[in-house]
Design a protein with these regions (language model features):
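N-terminal active-site beta-alpha-beta segment that forms phosphate/nucleotide-binding
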Residues: 19-100
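Acidic, Ala/Val/Gly-enriched low-complexity intrinsically disordered segments
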Residues: 10, 17-18
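Conserved phosphate- and dinucleotide-binding cores of soluble alpha/beta proteins
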Residues: 1, 6, 20-30, 81-242
C-alpha cells in the first residue's frame, strides 16, 4: 500500500497552499447531470440548496423519481421556463419550481417527519468539506454570520444514502476533499459518494476517496493535486459519461 500512502502525503501538503489547476472546470449543470445518473427508479430524493437543485433538470426520461424539498414539497419537476415562474411555488432555496401531476404541498413539520422517519431514500447535498471517512461540513464557517443549519443535520442523520455534489477546491484554491474536516461538522461517516468537476469518488471501507471516474480531459495527476485526503486509484478508473 505504499503508493496509496504517497498519494495521501502529497494531498495533505496541498491543503493550505493554493492549487494552480490548468484544466477547464465542469459546470454545475454538468455535475448535476452526472449525479442524476445515480438515482434509481422509484426513489424519494431530497435535493439540497444550491447546485444539487439542478439535478431536477437532468432526471432520466421515463423513470419515476419523486423529488422532496424540506420546506414542504413532494413531486417537484424541473425548473420553470423563463416567464412561466409562479412566485408561490419555491423550493427550500427560494428558487421557483414546477410541480408534477400528483404533487403534494404540506407544512415543514410533516416534511421533517418524513425525513426523520427515513422515508427519504437519497439526499444530494453541497458541502464545504468532506473527510476521507465520509464526514461532512456544510453549514457554518467560524466568524461568519449564518441563519442556521437548515435541514442538513436532519437529512444526514436520517437519509439512507447521501451523495455530495460540490467543487473540489475552494475559492482559495484549497482542496475540499480532506483527511479530516476543519469546519464544524454536519454529520459523521454519512457520505457515500462525491461528485466534483474533476471526478466521481466513493468513500472506501476503512476510509479514503476511491476514484471511480475522471471528468473528460482531467488527468489523475490533476486530481492528486486537488485531493488533500487519502486518494485511492486503481486500474478500473474510467472517464465520466455526461
Amino acid at each position: 500500500h505504499l503508493g496509496w500512502w504517497l498519494q495521501k502525503s502529497v494531498g495533505m501538503n496541498n491543503r493550505h497552499a493554493a492549487i494552480n489547476m490548468t484544466y477547464t472546470r465542469k459546470t454545475k449543470d454538468q455535475m448535476a447531470a452526472r449525479v442524476a445518473q445515480d438515482i434509481p427508479e422509484g426513489a424519494y430524493v431530497n435535493l439540497g440548496i444550491g447546485m444539487p437543485t439542478q439535478v431536477a433538470n437532468h432526471l432520466p426520461a421515463g423513470l419515476e423519481i419523486i423529488l422532496h424539498s424540506e420546506n414542504g414539497l413532494l413531486g417537484m419537476g424541473p425548473f420553470p421556463k423563463e416567464g412561466k415562474q409562479d412566485p408561490d411555488l419555491i423550493n427550500a432555496g427560494k428558487q421557483t419550481i414546477t410541480l408534477l401531476d400528483g404533487a403534494s404541498i404540506f407544512d415543514s413539520a410533516m416534511s421533517f417527519g418524513m425525513i426523520r422517519a427515513q422515508k427519504v431514500d437519497l439526499t444530494i447535498l453541497g458541502a464545504m468539506e468532506v473527510s476521507e471517512h465520509g464526514d461532512i461540513a456544510n453549514w457554518k464557517i467560524p466568524g461568519k454570520m449564518v441563519k442556521g443549519m437548515g435541514g442538513a443535520m436532519d437529512l444526514v442523520a436520517s437519509a439512507k444514502n447521501i451523495i455530495v455534489a460540490m467543487q473540489q477546491v475552494n475559492k482559495a484554491g484549497q482542496s475540499k476533499l480532506m483527511e479530516k474536516c476543519e469546519l464544524p461538522l454536519t454529520g459523521v461517516k454519512c457520505v457515500k459518494k462525491i461528485v466534483t468537476e474533476l471526478g466521481v469518488y466513493e468513500i472506501a471501507d476503512g476510509g479514503g476517496f476511491k476514484l471511480l471516474e475522471t471528468a473528460p480531459g482531467v488527468s489523475i495527476e490533476h486530481i492528486k493535486k486537488a485531493t488533500a485526503g487519502w486518494l485511492i486509484v486503481d486500474e478500473n478508473v474510467k472517464e465520466m459519461s455526461l
